[in-house]
Amino acid sequence: MSVWALFAFFSLFLSLSVRGSAEQCGRQAGDALCPGGLCCSSYGWCGTTVDYCGIGCQSQCDGGGGGDGGDDGCDGGDDGGGDGDDGYLSDIIPKSKFDALLKFRNDARCPAAGFYTYNAFISAAKEFPDFGNTGDDLMRKREIAAFLGQTSHETTGGWPDAPCGPYAWGYCYLKEINCQPYCDPSSNYQCVAGKQYCGRGPIQLSWNYNYGLCGDDLKLPLLQEPELVETDPVISFKTAIWFWMKPQSPKPSCHAVITGNWTPSAADLEAGRVPGYGVITNIINGGIECGQGGPNAANEDRIGFYKKYCDSLGTTYGSNLDCYQQRPFGYGLSGLKDTM
């Protein structure tokens, strides 16, 4: 056998061996993460080139640069401790990790500086036992990453060349700029004279019907005193987690979507609404951001926060991160408004 024939034989053997071996990461390998922070390709293999870290990458798509503590002061690890939260969610997101992910929330340039505390987050979360506590650790971390990703976009103070990048500036804002009444007179929850129901808190709760329904469920006078969402940090976080956990037909809850407990109907599938982070964007602001056929800045920002937080917490992204091809839930239904 010639040298070239031997070379061809061994090349074919190596190719078949690699193709025949088990995938290393992602959905092909039980949502496993690559060692050393390597990217997981769409096909379930670990590496650092654009083939692994580019389009379709499933996790750790910065190629190992995030979440492990860099010398630029932009990434922070956690110390593995409970940080005084009595163990609730501390195995998923201790205080040190919360502080690292929301690094600039207390910066003097942020209007919400000093408001969004870890203790307020934990106190509010305890009122919703399934929040961050459904499924295995990867799923639990994914839910926290998704919640913080969406709410960080809603409250971001970042800009493209901001210190540590745009995704270090979540939870910078507390109240919508140029607050408007946001009063729907057709709602069962009639507006109180002189009150404004503009976006407030992590999820930017908006409209009188959301304040009213949320207030009923939480047993708080939010319709009469919407300002509570911007003056009490525990209440503020409660409204955000309430919205996350609450299905409002025809929309499922964000919690059900991210934990894999939502099954799309035939109408959902026809509208392109399939399980994944993108449907959560549709739930929150689909009428403005979804169904445009291609990328938009708001979607990209939500996804950017989510990927950063998934990488830092050590979980995978899942599929269907955007809603570019999804029709909004309210499409063709008179009277149905976006909730944000």
UniProtKB/Swiss-Prot annotation:
Pfam families: Chitin_bind_1, Glyco_hydro_19. SMART domains: ChtBD1 (SM00270). GO terms for biological process: cell wall macromolecule catabolic process; chitin catabolic process; defense response to fungus; polysaccharide catabolic process. Disulfide bonds join C25-C40, C34-C46, C39-C53, C57-C61, C110-C172, C183-C191, C290-C323. Gene3D superfamilies: 1.10.530.10, Endochitinase, domain 2, Endochitinase-like. Residues 86-340 are annotated as: Chitinase. InterPro entries: Chitin-bd_1, Chitin-binding_1_CS, Endochitinase-like_sf, Glyco_hydro_19, Glyco_hydro_19_cat, Lysozyme-like_dom_sf. Residues 23-63 form the Chitin-binding type-1 domain. Its EC number is 3.2.1.14. It catalyses: Random endo-hydrolysis of N-acetyl-beta-D-glucosaminide (1->4)-beta-linkages in chitin and chitodextrins. GO terms for molecular function: chitin binding; endochitinase activity. The active site is at E154 (proton donor). It is an enzyme of class 3 (hydrolase). Induction: By wounding. Residues 64-85 are annotated as: Spacer. Keywords: Carbohydrate metabolism, Chitin degradation, Chitin-binding, Disulfide bond, Glycosidase, Hydrolase, Plant defense, Polysaccharide degradation, Signal. Residues 1-22 form the signal peptide. Defense against chitin-containing fungal pathogens. PANTHER family: CHITINASE 12 (PTHR22595:SF79), CHITINASE-RELATED (PTHR22595). Belongs to the glycosyl hydrolase 19 family. Chitinase class I subfamily. This is Acidic endochitinase WIN6. It comes from Populus trichocarpa.
